C-alpha cells in the first residue's frame, strides 16, 4: 500500500499498490523462467525431439538432427549453460550473498544480461533488416527460419537479457 497525503492537514489515504510493481523480485523470477524454458527446449531437441526444430534453421538445426555423440555433447553443454543462467538469476532472490560473493553474483548476472541483450538485439536488428530487404546477405536466406529468429528465438534472448538486467538493477538498488 502506498500512502498519499492530501491537503494542508495532511490527511493520509492508503492507495493499493499493484502487485506487479510492488514485488521487486519478479524480474529475477521471470529471467529464471525464461532461462529454464529455453533450456527445456534445447534439452528436447538434444534428446531427439524435432517439434519446431525447423524454425531454428542453419547450423543449430543440422547439429540437432545429426544424433551423434558430438551433437549430444554440444546440446547438453548448451542446456547446462542455460540452467546455470537460470540458477544465477534465482540467486538474485537470496539474501545471503554479501561482499565479494555478492559482487561476483551481480557481475555474473550483469555479464549474462549484456551478452543476451547484445546477441538477441543484434540478431533481431540484422534479421529484421534482411527481412525488410534493406540488407542483402551474400548467401541464400531461409526466410522461414529467419522470421522465427527475428520474432521469437532471438527476441526471446533480447527480452530475457533485458529482464535480467532489470533484476540486477533492482538487486543493486535494494542493497544501497
Question: Which residues does each predicted region cover?
Answer:
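Cytoplasmic juxtamembrane regions at transmembrane-helix boundaries
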Residues: 2-24, 88-113, 173-176
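Alpha-helical transmembrane segments
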Residues: 28-39
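C-terminal TM-helix exit segments that contain a strictly Trp-centered aromatic cap at the helix terminus
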Residues: 37-49, 114-131
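Hydrophobic transmembrane helix segments
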Residues: 38-73
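Transmembrane helix-loop junctions in multipass membrane proteins, especially transporters and channels
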Residues: 47-54, 94-97, 128-135, 169-176
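Interfacial non-cytosolic loop connecting adjacent transmembrane helices
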Residues: 59-61, 123-149
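Individual transmembrane alpha-helices with interfacial aromatic-anchor signatures
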Residues: 73, 108, 141-160
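Hydrophobic cores of alpha-helical transmembrane segments in multi-pass inner/ER membrane proteins
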Residues: 77-87, 151-167
